[in-house]
Amino acid sequence: MSISHPDTVLIIDFGSQVTQLIARRVRAMGVYCEIVPFQLALEGVKRLRPQAVILSGSPYSVIDDGSPRAPMEIFEIGVPVLGICYGEQVMCVQLGGKVESGHRREFGRAFLEVQEKSALFDGVWEKGSCYQVWMSHGDHVAALPEGFRVIGTSKGAPYAAIADEKRCLYAVQFHPEVVHTPDGTKLLQNFVHKISGLKGNWSMASYRDQAIATIRKKVGKSRVICGLSGGVDSSVVAVLLHEAIGDQLTCILVDHGLMRKNEAEEVLKLFRDHYNIELIHVNAANIFLNALEGETDPEKKRKTIGRLFIEVFEEETKKIEGVEFLAQGTLYPDVIESVSAIGESVTIKSHHNVGGLPERMNMKLVEPLRELFKDEVRSLGRELGLPEQFLGRHPFPGPGLAIRCPGAVTREKLEIIREADAIYLDEICKAGLYDEIWQAFVVLLPVQTVGVMGDGRTYEFVCALRAVTSVDGMTADFYPYDMEFLSKTAARIINEVRGINRVVYDITSKPPGTIEWE
């Protein structure tokens, strides 16, 4: 589902790990932008008609044979272009300059000395002063193309910032998009607002109105189904669609018996009772738990749950007449990953999604969130009036509690983990910590230990508490609870949950660990 935007920045991705940060910074300015891999850059120009272009960094060396290039047309269409790191080098090489392998590499914090005034530095950096930046390069520009001048230098990069103001071409060897370049966002604002003249009119309010109009045009009078889990993405999709097409929407909640305590009831209460959305609740717990019986391999558990979800969802859909469209909560990072500039990434875990549904069910897709990042989805949810209880929820995996029970999943273990998890989250909320934490949950270990309760000996399970801070889930640190909180939470779990006699806290960061245990 494509929505038109009057002011657009095109970001050409050469495979940098921080390309998405560029997009997030630009969108935070109220300007719409899209990332396209370098192979599709020309198609992106024709489709988006951008008012500015940014060239990303890259793990490649511009000196190597076959390394990525930008289409020459990018420099000839008359819009401002900003090259970042590899983007600077590729701009120079393609326009007649020279890049060499550096004898002095720069990785991490560095200092740039401003040599000349420039529109890029206007109101931020002064000529003759030094400023902290973040570098990550081995090669460096050795000779400038005709028309360029040097505006900033560093110890390892004699052309750390360059400009050809006549053609509105700018480039920097450092990364302005990362927080380690303190003034980086201001420099990007200069490029987007002052140099490119973009106004910053893009907002979630305008996106909501455009999305509703686009949905109505695409769907017409047809019926749409939507898988609803109660998570942020599916909740926002459901409410947005309902606002657009009303009773043409039917939502299906597949209850696989692996949800948290009272979760299904909360979803039904909000969407069926409050929003009056037609919602079919499928209690499929027996189907899922019987299929998972005795299975200990985490990958097989995920695949079994994914396969059964599709089968149950498909069976329910057959009972609804006239369905032509399937709504999905695909987000922009999913879209970016699917057309990666450097190919598919290594599979760490199978992701639980309904991506296999359209092919099997012969339906058209409606993906109203496919242009948004996660934080933007939450903002859209607020525009739609969704309660914070749903919008502020921690991420919850599609396979549910099955991957928080290492080893075989049983009904007894699920009841134990539900109760322990509810207590843990309750204590987090009471302490006012919920919004400080990216994700928090209990893992029930397939280990039993000896304990003493009263005058009796116990032999019960160990549970691990997990809590992490993160920005995007790609990296994470454990949350530094104080001992009083951990002591109080552990005491409640042991005293109130039958089946647990020992509590531990997981202090592993990501990497090397993952956030979930399976």
From Swiss-Prot:
Task: Give the metabolic or biological pathway.
Answer: Purine metabolism; GMP biosynthesis; GMP from XMP (L-Gln route): step 1/1
For this chain, one GO molecular function annotation is: ATP binding
Which reactions appear under catalytic activity for this entry? XMP + L-glutamine + ATP + H2O = GMP + L-glutamate + AMP + diphosphate + 2 H(+)
Active-site residues are: 85, 175, 177
> Is ATP-binding found in the keyword set?
yes
Pfam families membership? GATase, GMP_synt_C, NAD_synthase
Q: What class of enzyme is it?
A: ligase
What range(s) does the Glutamine amidotransferase type-1 domain occupy?
8-201
User: Could you give the subunit structure recorded for this chain?
Assistant: Homodimer.
PANTHER family cross-referenced by the UniProt entry? GMP SYNTHASE [GLUTAMINE-HYDROLYZING], GMP SYNTHASE-RELATED
UniProt protein name: GMP synthase [glutamine-hydrolyzing]
What organism is listed for this UniProt entry?
A: Bartonella quintana (strain Toulouse)
